[in-house]
Amino acid sequence: MNFNVWNVKEMLSIPSGSGITKPSNWNNNQTDCSLSDSQFLFGSQFCPENSETLLPSLDAGACLRHPKQTQQNSVDSEPSIFIKYQAKPQLLGGDTKDESLFSLPLPVGKSKGLSKQFEEKKRRATDQSDSETLHSFVSHFPEVINKLQTSVEKTEENLSSRSQSILDSVETIAKTFQETARVQHDLMVESVRDKGSMEQAILEIQRTCAARQAEFMEMKSTLKNLEVLVVEQTKNLQQFCDNLSQLIVPGILEELKKFTSVPQVAGHLKDSTSQTSPSLTQSLHFTRQEKHPSEEPATWQAQEAPAGNPSTSSQRPGECGVWDEGAESGVFQKAALPTDGLHRGDGHVKNKTVPTYCKNWVMTTRSVSNHFSNLPSQRAGNGQGLMAQGASQRDVSKFEARVKNACPEYGPQSMCSFDSLEQSATEQKGRPCRKRRRGKKQQPQRSKRGGLLDRKQGQTSKAACAFIARHHCPQSPVCDPQGPLICWLTPRSSTKSTCHILGGTGETSQTARAAQGNLVQHSQRSSTDSSSQGDQQINWFSDLSLENLEPPQCKKGGTNLLCDPDFDSSDDNF
């Protein structure tokens, strides 16, 4: 809606009697009393200088007339109608540009003064409002600044506390990280060390296990060898027990009793009271060799000790014995040694060719020592002459035949030995034993004695031949149960063999005692030595085999245990 039209309608709606209630200033300034408001307004368009004076009064009158409208306009912040009307261009004249169009005969100075006043008032109002706004803003500005300062301070405090807490937390986190890293490093180092030590221990355990395994394997092989050895030893022990079971102990004891019950024959004697060197009796030294649990459980050797001085015409023959286990004869063979007479004069030996036939008596039981330990006392009581023990010619011939059958390849050697023994016995036949007597000559020996000696020498030669044949036979007594159970030892070399005849009233010289003193041998070994017996049993088990059953005495000589020899009755001071 156009403001100008609105203003016209408003002006037309104003009652006519309103001019009476105008203020006094209106009356004072009124040039024409008969003009109404519309006329005035209309005239102001043409005469602006007149309307300027009436403008404040019109404003006041308008406010009084329309209080509600003014209030509404104030609420709406709208300017008054007069201000609007004046602000609008002139109704007829308009702007200065259009002054030529509607030029009215109005004074120009008055119209310009009214507009200037209006503009100044308007400017003043705007300046006042601006100043009030600025004043209010400026008055609030310190408070805002104070608030900003307080807020900034609070923010700084908060930031400082926050930063301090953050720094503290960061420091604690860093320390925690450092401690954790150090602990982890220590743990890793310890774990690496433990791992290295464990690996070293595992290597050591592996080496130890390998060594133990090697030892176990070696032990297993040793156990297998021991088992095999135990089986072999068991077999050998069984064979040994079988061989021992073949021995007849009662028969052996009977043969020993027969041997000890044979009467002893007196030697070749001559009456002489001037005998300087008494003849030494055949002293049997029973020695027990090392006990070998072989085919012959125990071996006893009877030997004669060597003479101390050859000039004293000491007798040095050997003794030998044969044990025949055959069921036919059952006779214990005995051989008597040949004797030779003494040369008249200074007592030197003339017959130097008679060899020692054998060295040892070989027995098969330990009980032989109990019987033979009593023999020296029997011969000492018998005393005078050479003890010669013989056996029947029939038993000797049977023995020789058995030896020849067992060892046919050694037959010529046995015969050769027998011939040599016969020849030596024949040479001894015609030589009488002579002894010097003080101041008297001895009578020649009777031929009867010589015949007896010849017969004894023949039997002795045959027995010695049997011993030699048995020595060279490779078969063992266990393999040939019909053969004699003996072990032949190597005979000594030929020595001076003489026969000393003990005179009834002759005195023993100091040299004879010295010769007898040399008969004692001190190399003896206790029969109760259990440790030596255990070693001997081990040696026997190692030497025992089915192919070679030779008696251990033939392979390895043992230490002999000597018994006390028998002496002459005149040797009481020995």
From Swiss-Prot:
It comes from Mus musculus. This is Interactor of HORMAD1 protein 1. Residues 217-240 form a coiled coil. The modification Phosphoserine is found at S476, S569, S570. Keywords: Chromosome, Coiled coil, Differentiation, DNA recombination, Meiosis, Oogenesis, Phosphoprotein, Spermatogenesis. GO terms for biological process: DNA recombination; homologous chromosome pairing at meiosis; meiotic DNA double-strand break formation; oogenesis; regulation of homologous chromosome segregation; spermatogenesis. Disruption phenotype: Mice develop normally without obvious somatic defects but males and females are sterile due to defects in homologous synapsis. Oocytes are depleted in six-week-old females and spermatocytes in males undergo apoptosis at a stage equivalent to wild-type mid-pachytene. Complete synapsis is never observed and incomplete synaptonemal complexes are detected in meiocytes equivalent to late-zygotene and pachytene. Required for DNA double-strand breaks (DSBs) formation in unsynapsed regions during meiotic recombination. Probably acts by forming a complex with MEI4 and REC114, which activates DSBs formation in unsynapsed regions, an essential step to ensure completion of synapsis. Not required for HORMAD1 functions in pairing-independent synaptonemal complex formation, ATR recruitment to unsynapsed axes, meiotic silencing of unsynapsed chromatin (MSUC) or meiotic surveillance. Detected in spermatocytes and testis (at protein level). Residues 372-381 have a biased composition (Polar residues).
